[in-house]
Amino acid sequence: MSKVLLIDIGGTNLRYAYSDGNYSSLNDTNKIQLSCIKGFDEILTNLTKEKDVDSLVISVAGPKINGSITMTNRDFSINEQDIKNTFKFKSCHLLNDWESIGHSLAAYESSDIAIIKDGTEFNDNSFFIGPGTGLGAALLIGDDNVIPTEIGNTTGLTKALLKNYAIDNADHFRTLEDVLSGKAISDIYEYKTGQRLSSEDIVQRYGSDDEMANYVIDGFIKSLAETISDMALTFIAGRGIYIAGGLIRSIFQIMDKEKFIEYFYGDKKLVHLQILEMIKIGIVEKEHACLHGNLNFYKKHINKA
């Protein structure tokens, strides 16, 4: 029986899985830590050898332009037609990673979404955002139309959010993901203390006597709430805002939800406050969002190959 190979290349790992039959689940899910992915063809050869794979859906962290993606955080480029021709796939689809996450919504049960704030749906717009190695985001309109963004590399909000960390010097922090990502947590902690720790270690120190860890995480939480508040109004996300990624799943366990909602509302004027009050905010608790999104995308396009 032929299979589809699903691959997600993020800033740190390559994750993969297979699916076949009615394409309802992921099989043999695994990951490869990446220090360099210049040998991607070799990796792909190993993943398809004697596996009866005839189709590939691959999501990559970077903007898709004319069928190609060049990663923003790595020296790596990929073209879907080149891959299809080289490996003789029946079909090959290349997605931006957040395009893939937008397609993942249909895979979730209600138990897969932890609710920070309930809401009332008033249109078909869903907004996804996730601070990880960088900061990704996408808009889902209805169930099929996903518009990935490069919000993490914009600069308009950075200076305002630096105030949440009591940083006046913006020279080291220019883009939104410089102040709102896992890397940002590490960079800001190091900027404040001179000590380099992983974002995971800093999150684990939250609530301890490490005052700077507490301060940085509090600043991060406020920055996230203020950012999604602006995104909610920018995209009128009447179907909800969904925050994804392992980092936010960890922070969700320790953060003050009521304070987060207070930051989300901010000092918006009445009519805009009323919009925010209707918007649901959820945390995607299901792992492998991109792989699920890749599979859902494939199922939608299986008869179009």
Model-derived features: positions:
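Short beta-strand scaffold segments in enzyme catalytic cores
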Residues: 6, 14-18, 62, 128-130, ...
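Short, flexible, glycine-rich and Lys/Arg-enriched loop motifs at helix boundaries
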Residues: 68-74, 103-122, 252-278
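Glycine-rich beta-strand-to-loop/alpha-helix junction loops that act as flexible
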Residues: 58-63, 130-133, 238-248
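Short beta-strand-loop/turn "lid" adjacent to the catalytic site in phosphate-handling enzymes
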Residues: 49-94, 103-110, 252-253
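Glycine-rich phosphate-binding loop of actin/hexokinase-like ATP-binding domains
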Residues: 118, 123-176, 260-265, 269, ...
